Design a protein with these regions (language model features):
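Rossmann-like NAD(P) dinucleotide-binding subdomain of oxidoreductase/dehydrogenase enzymes
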Residues: 55-182
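Glycine-rich loop-to-alpha-helix module at the N-terminal edge of alpha/beta enzyme cores
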Residues: 1-54, 64
Length: 182
């Protein structure tokens, strides 16, 4: 229900969110209104559907392939994203975290925090306190703080190879998984 409510909030505020996203990163309003904002809402709806799957079910997909569905929340996920798709990237990262029953600390790009901060404001009454946390600031300070913090059970990063290497090393030192889009 929460993910569908988030999608509805995005739909209800699509013009406003598209304007904020365009002001935030300079992308043409025609793109944010026609692509970024609707795709974000669709992404929350998609994951709302995913969590309807039967927990613990098993399917034989082929001679040597068995598919198992288990729900095992991993814990707090630290996520760091780049400047170019701030709102859509937030949807891509947040929807699966919520669907899996986890919490996140979401670090925006220091140059494009506005649309994610506005999104967080709009959904604050739908998402329980402490589940979706947004931090801003320079990557060398707030991003590094996340990499050094012992409370994360997974790290996710989208951006440069150089920083991605640092994220991978931080995850390896903690023996936690990392998702890297470089």
């Amino acid at each position: 229900a929460v993910l569908n409510k988030i999608a509805a909030i995005i739909d209800e505020n699509k013009e406003h969110l598209a304007m904020v996203e365009s002001m935030d990163n300079g992308k043409p309003i025609r793109e944010t209104l026609a692509v970024d904002i609707p795709m974000a809402a669709d992404h929350f709806r998609y994951f709302a559907g995913c969590i309807q799957a039967e927990e613990g079910s098993a399917n034989i997909l082929g001679k040597d392939t068995l598919s198992l569905i288990l729900r095992e929340p991993i814990g707090v996920v630290g996520q760091i994203v780049p400047w170019n798709f701030p709102f859509l990237m937030a949807a891509w990262k947040l929807a699966p975290v919520l669907a899996s029953g986890c919490c996140t600390v979401f670090k925006t790009s220091s140059t494009t925090p506005l649309s994610v901060l506005e999104f967080a404001r709009l959904v604050q009454d739908v998402i329980p306190a402490g589940v979706f946390n947004v931090i801003t600031g320079s990557g060398s300070k707030s991003g590094q703080y996340m990499l050094d913090h012992p409370g994360f059970r997974k790290l996710a990063f989208t951006g440069s190879t150089e920083v991605g290497r640092n994220v991978a090393l931080a995850a390896a030192q903690k023996l936690i998984p990392a998702t890297l889009e470089l």
